[in-house]
């Protein structure tokens, strides 16, 4: 009798519309219950039965109820699922498959089946790519996923690499395309094969893309010629290989190996500036004044060169520091090293005064066994030979930025606008609190930004510097010229790594148009979007593989009294994030390991401090000795505690 009662329907509608609702993101716990973190910072309890309808990270709307004087929410509609495409491990029971997502807060296995075009027979422990197909809040009975790609077996030693590349949908191998013949068109090449060009790289490098030559002008100034490998002589714009390079955007450097942007036949052989091999290059010649300033005689041209020596960073550094056994093979090479050293010192001094110089941070290199096991982690400090190459490349990129700006008005530029205007007042307040006077409008200028950076670099600790970095904007890729505040330069356009960066290939083509006087086509905006997105994915992949390898490396140190010196890189609500300075690993120190009484302890992300009973015990940038408390291999996380 009530079935079609309009009054009842109206009452239901009224109750539905009067029920309060909240929108937010589901936060799971390992206890079965969860929370809905609403956009207004408020958190609502989700009881275990309701958590079965949602997944950690889902954005939902939920109805709000009161139960036993406590506000709880019941999930109602799905706005955006947390999981769409994901990687995970297969479970097999009675020929039924399920997959556990590879995520620290997703512990439940999701029923699944293989897509029709996937021929692999999945076994327990296999890794796979899956896509969500059903969700309870979409009216389905439960969660269900479809396996779209087999990655590898559970016991494959290379799991960290293959799983990470699949997670970020990145290529696993070099492009399988043959390079074409060289096409120079109207480009005329100067013959510089008699000059003593040298390359300086890591000893293991095969894709050498820059060679240097210096001439002493006899009046205190030097003439620097930067010769860069010329892959665009072999890769025509719009060709199949060009489309592949554009899609990849960069060579992907992961611990242990790289996945090149171009076929290895090009990157490691045909284009690589190998010693005693005649190679086509794009070159730039410029005068370096005695004070390090770049002359106004910047000249770009095409050439043939023949590198006379493949030098290694450590050997060159040892020789300049008068240590070790290594000697240059002849006087001409020795003279080039001396002149390059002069270029480096002059340019470094000029940049320190007129621009900005990054503080040297060490690189960490994994030494891996044949089965992907970590034998050791080597700290590689930046030495004088690294700085020689860096100064030459920065000079070359400034030259390209000037020429492209003045001749064309466009190119692929690296742009960094310093402080985010939205955050500038907060930055001024923080500076003022620490006794540094600053004006918001001045800080938004290149000159004002550089002045502040020099002041911060002169501080006795990195604390204020690390607090201020939070208010800076991110570097971007732009077709329009603009300043790079981080480098303290008015414009910066890279062209020195065309074997491994697609943006540099684009700039090569534009520079060639300037050289030949032909019309240049302005790059499309979607190129910059692709470059930025691929750079983000490659960095995440490098970090993910690194986390996996660090967890493997440190697992046998857990629970021992092996001490590591660590730097505090962040203060969070729950404790401290630290970097182990001996190997570069990032670990977390829960606040409970620092002080047992929670109410007496305050972790302030805003202030970058951890205080106990009102006294600051640790600040961001401080160093302390730690021991490894626990390594969670399944989530690749390292938990540390202060050493006793």
Curated annotation (Swiss-Prot):
Annotated PANTHER family: EXORIBONUCLEASE 2, RIBONUCLEASE
EC number: 3.1.13.1
Organism superkingdom: Bacteria
GO MF term set: exoribonuclease II activity; RNA binding
Biological process terms in GO annotation: mRNA catabolic process
Keywords annotated in UniProt: Cytoplasm, Exonuclease, Hydrolase, Nuclease, RNA-binding
Source species taxonomy: Bacteria, Pseudomonadati, Pseudomonadota, Gammaproteobacteria, Enterobacterales
Cited InterPro entries: CSD, NA-bd_OB-fold, RNase_B_OB_dom, RNase_II, RNase_II/R, RNase_II/R_CS, RNase_II/RNase_R, RNR_Ribonuclease
UniProt-recorded name of the protein: Exoribonuclease 2
Gene name of this polypeptide: rnb
Record field: catalytic activity: Exonucleolytic cleavage in the 3'- to 5'-direction to yield nucleoside 5'-phosphates
Domain S1 motif: 561-643
Family: Belongs to the RNR ribonuclease family. RNase II subfamily.
Classification via SMART domains: CSP, RNB
Domain RNB: 189-516
GO cellular component assignments: cytosol
Subcellular location(s) per record: Cytoplasm
Predominant cellular place of this UniProt entry's protein: cytoplasm
Source organism per UniProt: Pectobacterium carotovorum subsp. carotovorum (strain PC1)
């Amino acid at each position: 009798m009530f079935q079609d009662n309009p009054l009842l329907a109206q009452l239901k509608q009224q109750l539905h519309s009067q029920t309060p609702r909240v929108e937010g993101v589901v936060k799971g716990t390992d206890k079965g219950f969860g929370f809905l973190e609403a956009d207004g910072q408020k958190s609502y309890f989700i009881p275990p039965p309701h958590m079965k309808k949602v997944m950690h990270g889902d954005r939902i709307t939920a109805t709000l109820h009161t139960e036993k004087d406590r506000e709880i929410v019941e999930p109602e509609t799905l706005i955006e699922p947390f999981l769409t495409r994901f990687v995970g491990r297969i479970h097999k029971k009675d020929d039924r498959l399920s997959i556990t997502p590879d995520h620290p807060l997703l512990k439940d296995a999701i029923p699944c089946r293989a897509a029709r075009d996937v021929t692999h027979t999945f076994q327990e422990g296999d890794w796979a790519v899956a896509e969500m197909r059903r969700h309870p809040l979409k009216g389905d009975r439960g969660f269900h996923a479809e396996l779209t790609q087999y990655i590898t077996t559970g016991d494959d030693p290379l799991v960290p690499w293959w799983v990470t590349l699949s997670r970020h949908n990145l290529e696993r191998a070099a492009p399988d395309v043959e390079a074409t013949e060289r096409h120079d068109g109207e480009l005329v090449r100067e013959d510089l094969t008699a000059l003593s060009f040298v390359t300086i790289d890591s000893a293991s490098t095969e894709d050498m893309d820059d060679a240097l030559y210096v001439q002493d002008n006899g009046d205190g100034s030097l003439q620097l010629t930067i010769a860069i490998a010329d892959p665009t002589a072999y890769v025509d714009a719009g060709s199949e290989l060009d489309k592949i390079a554009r899609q990849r955007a960069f060579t992907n450097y992961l611990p242990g190996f790289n996945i090149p942007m171009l076929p290895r036949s090009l990157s490691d052989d045909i284009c690589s500036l190998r010693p005693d091999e005649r190679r086509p290059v794009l070159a730039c010649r410029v005068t370096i004044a005695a004070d390090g300033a770049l002359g106004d005689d910047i000249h770009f041209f095409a050439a043939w060169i023949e590198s006379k020596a493949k030098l290694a960073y450590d050997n060159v550094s040892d020789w300049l520091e008068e240590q070790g056994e290594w000697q240059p093979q002849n006087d001409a090479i020795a003279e080039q090293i001396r002149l390059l050293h002069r270029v480096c010192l002059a340019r470094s001094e000029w940049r320190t005064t007129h621009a900005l110089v990054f503080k040297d941070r060490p690189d960490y290199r994994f030494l891996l066994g044949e089965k992907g096991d970590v034998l050791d982690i080597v700290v590689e400090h930046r030495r004088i030979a690294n700085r020689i190459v860096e100064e030459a490349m920065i000079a070359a990129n400034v030259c390209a930025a000037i020429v492209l700006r003045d001749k064309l008005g466009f190119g692929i530029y690296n742009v960094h606008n310093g402080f985010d205007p939205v955050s500038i007042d907060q930055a001024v307040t923080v500076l003022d609190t620490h006794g540094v006077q600053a004006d918001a409008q001045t800080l938004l200028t290149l000159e004002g930004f550089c002045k502040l950076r020099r002041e911060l670099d002169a501080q006795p600790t990195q604390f204020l510097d690390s607090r201020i970095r939070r208010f800076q904007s991110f570097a971007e890729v732009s077709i329009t010229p603009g300043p790079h505040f981080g480098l303290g330069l008015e414009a910066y356009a890279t062209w020195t790594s065309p074997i491994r960066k697609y943006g540099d290939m684009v700039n090569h083509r534009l520079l060639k148009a300037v050289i030949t006087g032909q019309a240049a086509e302005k790059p499309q905006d979607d190129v910059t979007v692709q470059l930025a997105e691929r750079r983000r994915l490659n960095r995440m992949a490098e970090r993910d593989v690194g986390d996996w390898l660090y967890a493997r490396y440190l697992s046998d140190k857990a629970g021992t009294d092996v001490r590591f010196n660590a730097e505090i890189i962040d203060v969070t609500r729950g404790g401290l994030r630290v970097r182990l300075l001996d190997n570069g690993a990032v670990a977390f120190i829960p606040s409970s390991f620092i002080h047992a009484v929670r109410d007496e302890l305050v972790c302030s992300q805003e202030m970058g401090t951890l205080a106990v009973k009102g006294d600051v015990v640790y600040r961001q940038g401080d160093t302390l000795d730690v021991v490894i408390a626990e390594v969670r291999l399944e989530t690749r996380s390292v938990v540390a505690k202060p050493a006793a």
